[in-house]
């Protein structure tokens, strides 16, 4: 049985439906992420799990018991917010111990569990400091320690890394993964950052307009997106309009606007005449000098419009002879070499046939 199960959960605010008939299940010990753009309903869903909001209909089951109308203080759930929510007049030790003091736990037990929680987040030396004496990352770890001290069944995190700089955010991601493995508590993480979701999660639910578009592992979400929205939202991708012209038990022939035909394996739900897009990730696009054209099958000629050098990789924007623009991501493998091609260089682009996916448009 799943630790947490949502069944047909709906939440409306007037005429606006923030969460639209959402169902999902989360296993014990899982690191699960709700990912989506601003306004997609992910925070509203998290608030209903926490008990800060109540669904208009549907069930929220924890260990098989419906808690949709249970007050937040009666749920074995803790929430960590982006703002840390630390008491400025309390030391680190007192901030972490606060939930146990409110529960009237014995002082000796409080001290033992407080020290254990701070050890788990590597802050044992900071017990007597106040929040204003801590860095952003240290404050966030205090918030995590306070969330874990009661050993909740679920730890909910509402964009907890959003206020940190890029380097600190990356460090905290590693610490969160290790912390979750160590304590074994189910983490539910809310973010609009695709990179955070892919780096942290065992499974991801991608939300849009109050609906869950796809649930899967990071590699499945990134590698086999269910539709155009997910393909475009998760990482960079090239999308080219296409139409299915023929389909059989063994092959599906597509006409790509401006690029001719390509053949892909068939899919059960796709029929001849279906419109959609061919999706190809930039890192799957190869770029060659024009002189190699005869050696490369299924190649397309064009010229470099622009490039972005970021140290380890360079992203090229290439305009094909047909007018279609393609992005390609190339590793800067040669030491000290900033890039391979210049603006206006004539080039050839190609990609493995198996790298292309057809995503059908559905109403």
Curated annotation (Swiss-Prot):
Keyword Transcription: no
Binding site for ATP: 36-43
Molecular function per GO: ABC-type putrescine transporter activity; ATP binding; ATP hydrolysis activity
Primary enzyme class: translocase
Keyword tags: ATP-binding, Cell inner membrane, Cell membrane, Membrane, Nucleotide-binding, Translocase, Transport
Predominant location category: membrane
Role according to the record: Part of the ABC transporter complex PotABCD involved in spermidine/putrescine import. Responsible for energy coupling to the transport system.
Entry protein name: Spermidine/putrescine import ATP-binding protein PotA
Species this protein is from: Nitrosomonas eutropha (strain DSM 101675 / C91 / Nm57)
Organism ancestry: Bacteria, Pseudomonadati, Pseudomonadota, Betaproteobacteria, Nitrosomonadales
Topological relation to the membrane, as annotated: Peripheral membrane protein
Coiled-coil portions: none
Subcellular location(s) per record: Cell inner membrane
CDD domains: ABC_PotA_N
Domain ABC transporter per the UniProt entry, residue ranges: 4-234
UniProt keyword Cell inner membrane, yes or no: yes
Recorded family membership: Belongs to the ABC transporter superfamily. Spermidine/putrescine importer (TC 3.A.1.11.1) family.
Catalytic activities: ATP + H2O + polyamine-[polyamine-binding protein]Side 1 = ADP + phosphate + polyamineSide 2 + [polyamine-binding protein]Side 1
Subunit composition and interactions: The complex is composed of two ATP-binding proteins (PotA), two transmembrane proteins (PotB and PotC) and a solute-binding protein (PotD).
EC code: 7.6.2.11
